[in-house]
Amino acid sequence: MTRAFIREKKWERALAFQTRNPLHRAHEYALVYGVEVLTAQGFYAGAVLNPLMGELKGDDVPAATRMLCYRKLHSERLLGQGDKDESIWKKAGWDISDVFELIGLDIKMFYGGPSEAVMHGIYRQNYGFSDIVIGRKHADAPFEDGKAIWGDFDAHEIFDNLKGELHIQPCKVGFAAFYESLGRVDLTERHEGEKPYSISGTKVREQLQAGERPDPRIMRPETSDVLIEAYRK
């Protein structure tokens, strides 16, 4: 069904974005960046938010709540709003929202780090995707004491050393954050020595649980409102 959908769209490349989280703007930017790279290369490329809908850890946001966030992003054409590179889309002749789609994937999360990143690539290849976003700490979870099991970019490196016939291409994305100098989110590797605006994930959750919207430089109000309502129940 997904393969048929991609064919119907007539995309030359189809980029999948794997996630188990509601998207704050830095998360969202990984998909924006990935499809902009392909579009700038001259491809008519689709950007598919492809969240896992199966079993997760107990402290992860439930799938039903996350889907409300994702649907809001999709239906209100919010992807990349304020963060996309307008020059790329002007040259292409279409907008990022015109090639943005939402398709859930009903598999569980194993929190297996780099090996699971490869598994996620295999799944997406089987579904007809040509590319997959591989971010920092992909499929990551720490030890019980909070210490890291894997390095931030181990999932990037594993794709460099694969043997066999995995044809899907990893779109490797690093840290992203909001920069006042740009007035938008960008990759931190482009801003050496510049401090981004940031809030810890713990602080964001505390604000949402208290019924407060996090700073819109971190999370879109539309996403915040869905999560605030969910925490009230």
Language model segments and positions:
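Active-site cores that bind ATP or allylic diphosphates and position pyrophosphate for catalysis
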Residues: M1-P22, A26-K233
